[in-house]
Amino acid sequence: MTERTLVLIKPDAVARGYVGEILSRIERKGLTIAALELRVASEEVAGSHYAEHAERPFYPSLLEFITSGPLVAAVLEGPRAIAAFRQLAGGTDPVDKALPGTIRGDFGLEAQQNLVHGSDSVESAEREIALWFPALSSI
């Protein structure tokens, strides 16, 4: 069964020149890029995307970071796309949790600026795709 997921290549990865490497890893994994856009996230979109963290102490710095510069938003498709990308990304904390060979394990330096975001469930993917790519929404 084909699944869709939202991936964000965050501003730190764009600034450090890792977009090509990350997209290459996605393609080598066998996932299809169904949509891709370079953009600067608005505070409104960023706030909606990270709404579940609104009461957390790191929320203001998270919004500041994700809106700080260009990012790449993409919709990936493929069998078990959500789990496949999350495996490719590695653990959220690049130093303590991400294994070598993963995007975060190879290039990440700290937990908040951890290069990429990938949806964590089918429900999250549907919500996030609707937010970032309304024309592709199935909601």
Curated annotation (Swiss-Prot):
Q: Which Gene3D superfamilies match?
A: Nucleoside diphosphate kinase-like domain (3.30.70.141)
Designated name of the protein: Nucleoside diphosphate kinase
Q: Looking at the Swiss-Prot or TrEMBL record, what is one Pfam family this protein matches?
A: NDK
Q: How does it assemble?
A: Homotetramer.
| GO CC term (a single one) | cytoplasm
Q: Which family does it belong to?
A: Belongs to the NDK family.
The lineage's top-level taxon is: Bacteria
GO terms in the biological process aspect are: CTP biosynthetic process; GTP biosynthetic process; UTP biosynthetic process
HAMAP family, sorted:
NDP_kinase
Instruction: Report the coiled-coil segments.
Output: none
- Gene this protein is translated from: ndk
> What is the organism field in this record?
Rhodococcus erythropolis (strain PR4 / NBRC 100887)
